[in-house]
Amino acid sequence: MNISKRITFFLLVCFISLPCIAHRHSGAYAAILENTSDYTDAEKLSRAVEYFQSGKYHEALIWFSKLDKKYKLNPRFQAYMGVCCYYDGEYERAIEALEPILSKLKAFAPHELAVYYYSVADSYFRLNKYIDAVPFYEKHTLLCYNNEKGDSLFRIGICYKHLGDIETAQEYFVEALAYFRRYNDTDRLKYIERELERSTDN
């Protein structure tokens, strides 16, 4: 299971434990409540979660944001918002939402933390801020499942390649290669082997 699917799966498991999830609108009831003003705040939260579960991250973010403006949601819900921003391609906003609260999430399970660190790391990466991405990818490798480590190690290698440190990039590529071989990630294996060849040629 790749990192994106694991992120979604993990957060869905977390959401299941929330009391508000027990309540579900029937189709008829949802049809009646067409206006956001018709929803109670508990229903808005439930609707935000429903959008998230169906992969509608933009819609989920709108609902979470409305509640955050009214109540200033706790760090966990703010973290969910950050993940929504990441999936919605709002990378700067994802960083702004997640990075300041990471220190408040230390009590959470390691893999939940891994999700948040990866979202920050990959947001920096996609913004071409490679030097900022590296420490968050490194933290992710300490928290994530073993079959996810190769992805972050590979991306750290790419970061160092863009930063001009080819020797360090190769070290991370080799380490990532070991994980991809271990978990039989054939697509990544081919890609990283090409990267190693290019690095050697340089």
Regions found by a protein language model. Name each.
Residues 39-66, 70:
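Alpha-helical segment of the N-proximal tetratricopeptide repeat
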Residues 103, 161, 166-184, 190, ...:
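TPR/TPR-like (Sel1-like) alpha-helical repeat modules
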